[in-house]
């Protein structure tokens, strides 16, 4: 069955209209003593970044791994490294490890779909976003909520999203009378819960849903 028939997406009008994607937490990089730009990302957040077994389409090998990373975030990282005249090193980290990696100096920057919040601005600096994505709810095309047309129609569902995101922390709590499960560790884990029927819908961004 085609994906377009399996999934339906509903814009969540009562919550934030968009989130920033591809923002950086940046540390200064001196050209005098650094010739490699170390960029962290999940490598599991399609279409922004994902893991693949080869270098097709210009993918970059992941540090310490035989796998490669590609996606919009990798394309952006390659462009920045080229402009600086640096080599590029992609570091694969879990979502919750991205900001701490910048703070500790493990990496020079992060390119990720992170909303710019006051809490995060106290920990790292952000560039201007390179992309803004609409926040939506994603339901199964044959599920109980396939005909939902408004936030009101989403009441009473079992739901989740990815941990430490505005999807989970800010958006889902605004939908009344839901059974909010513990957050998923990653975007793929979130989608898996929807596919297996563990939840009725998830909150995510439009590109992730389409991927």
Give the location of each predicted region:
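Bacterial N-terminal signal peptides that target proteins for export
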Residues: 2-13
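Bacterial N-terminal signal peptides
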Residues: 12-22
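Sec-dependent signal peptide cleavage junction
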Residues: 20-33
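Extracytoplasmic small-molecule ligand-binding "clamshell" domains
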Residues: 34-114
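Bilobed "Venus flytrap"/periplasmic-binding protein-like clamshell domains
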Residues: 43-46, 66-82, 114, 133-191, ...
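Short, hydrophobic alpha-helical packing/hinge segments within bilobed ligand-binding/sensory domains
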Residues: 76-77, 98-101, 107, 189-193, ...
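Acidic, polar ligand-binding/catalytic clefts
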Residues: 78, 87-153
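A ligand-binding cleft/hinge motif common to bilobed small-molecule-binding domains
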Residues: 96-97, 113-123, 170-174, 195-211
């Amino acid at each position: 069955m085609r994906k377009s028939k399996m999934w339906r997406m509903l814009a969540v009008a009562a919550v934030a209209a968009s989130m920033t994607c591809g923002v950086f937490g940046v540390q200064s990089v001196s050209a005098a003593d650094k010739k490699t730009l170390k960029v962290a990302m999940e490598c599991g957040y399609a279409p922004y970044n994902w893991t693949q077994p080869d270098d097709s389409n210009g993918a970059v090998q992941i540090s310490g791994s035989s796998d490669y990373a590609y996606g919009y975030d990798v394309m952006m990282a390659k462009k920045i490294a080229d402009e600086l005249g640096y080599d590029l090193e992609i570091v694969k980290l879990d979502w919750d490890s991205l900001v701490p990696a910048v703070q500790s100096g493990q990496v020079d920057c992060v390119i990720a779909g992170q909303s710019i919040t006051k809490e995060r601005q106290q920990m790292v600096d952000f560039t201007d976003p390179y992309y803004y994505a609409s926040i939506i709810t994603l339901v199964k095309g044959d599920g109980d909520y396939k005909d939902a047309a408004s936030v009101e129609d989403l009441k009473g569902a079992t739901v989740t999203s990815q941990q430490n995101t505005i999807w989970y922390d800010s958006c889902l709590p605004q939908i009344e009378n839901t059974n909010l499960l513990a957050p998923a560790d990653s975007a793929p884990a979130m989608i898996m819960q929807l596919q297996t029927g563990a939840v009725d819908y998830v909150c995510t961004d439009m590109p992730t849903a389409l991927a």
